[in-house]
């Protein structure tokens, strides 16, 4: 048998072999987004600290807003104010809030949430302290308007919380922020019951400024939003923030490289009116306006009911007599209803305020299982009903019960629309979306004092029907919102 000949191995044959062999494929570099990192890191110690510090912004905001309700009877007497003048104070506070909300929203989308939050707190604390030295009614109105401008920036705290929370925790943690608003409301009412009768309303304002000053020092522990940093091209800062959070939570980062989306123009008002978001934006604005109108209407109506006892047109046994005081001009006597809240009045306000937390468990279940739209529609419809029930002649216990439920419902409304607005817009326009919504809703807050403190004195049923009708419109708008955000990841780009 002939032996098989083998070809000699040459350079040419090796070259042919190498050309025939497939080239090894390069491995694709793994990438991840901020959303991936937030979900991978999960919930932990950082988020608890974030919840406590950013949630405390609600304490400060509630104290500054509720302060007007407890101080109104005192300044009415001290400066001999008419009903419309008392209502005008609240209106101007919300006018300042409205003007600054859009400005702070634009600035936050361009320069960062953290910087604007800090600026708003410094502004608010400064002018709040100055208010306590107001020599006249005009100065008081002007300085409280400046406080309203500062308070409008506190919404950036909610945005920072929203952008750091994993998707499945947003529907649970964000409604719990209502606890801080409740704490602020209870704190200012309790302080007023002790401070006003002893050392006066000016010291109440000074003491109420302290929590905001303390909170400013705690902001250094909270970083700028990683989503904002990525949207502005500052990927390294976002990566450093996410790594710090992972370390604090004793968790891990996703493998790969953090990628940034296509850079777009940020913070443009026109984006809210783009065809993709036009219907959503318009309906959100209607809902915000109506919720604010109802919420502050309930708060101011509660104080007015207690101060003037308007239920069924009756007069309470404890109603003080009308005190006649001589004006500076000496031309005659001006009536001044010097009704300083009695201890029982403060107790009623505290009980009704506690209602703000009563429906929180049901509200959390509703927005997580029924969805944001249906849950909001139901609570708005119930709010309309309970406004009408206030017209029923009842005992003081019955009145407290109705006010309790109304405060619970309007608080649930605010919870849901805050969450929905923060979730429905993408990162480049989230702050301007929240800012414009917060600004327009103050129109409702500006009108509410004149309904609760002026129209209600002339036509109690007419005022209640107006509040109820607005709530019905909001319920319909909520039910027909085009986008449901339950279980939906935050959108990073438009």
Curated annotation (Swiss-Prot):
Q: Name one GO cellular component term.
A: membrane
Q: Which UniProt keywords apply?
A: Membrane, Transmembrane, Transmembrane helix, Transport
GO MF annotation terms: transmembrane transporter activity
Q: Does the keyword Acetylation apply?
A: no
User: Which residues span the membrane?
Assistant: 48-68, 86-106, 121-141, 179-199, 203-223, 281-301, 350-370, 385-405, 431-451, 460-480
Q: How does it sit in the membrane?
A: Multi-pass membrane protein
Q: Where in the cell is it found?
A: Membrane
Entry-linked PROSITE patterns? MFS
Q: Please give the chief subcellular localization of this protein.
A: membrane
Cite the Gene3D superfamilies for this sequence: MFS general substrate transporter like domains (1.20.1250.20)
**Domain of life, source organism:** Eukaryota
Q: Which family does it belong to?
A: Belongs to the major facilitator superfamily.
Q: What is this protein called?
A: Putative transporter SVOPL
Q: Which organism is it from?
A: Mus musculus (Mouse)
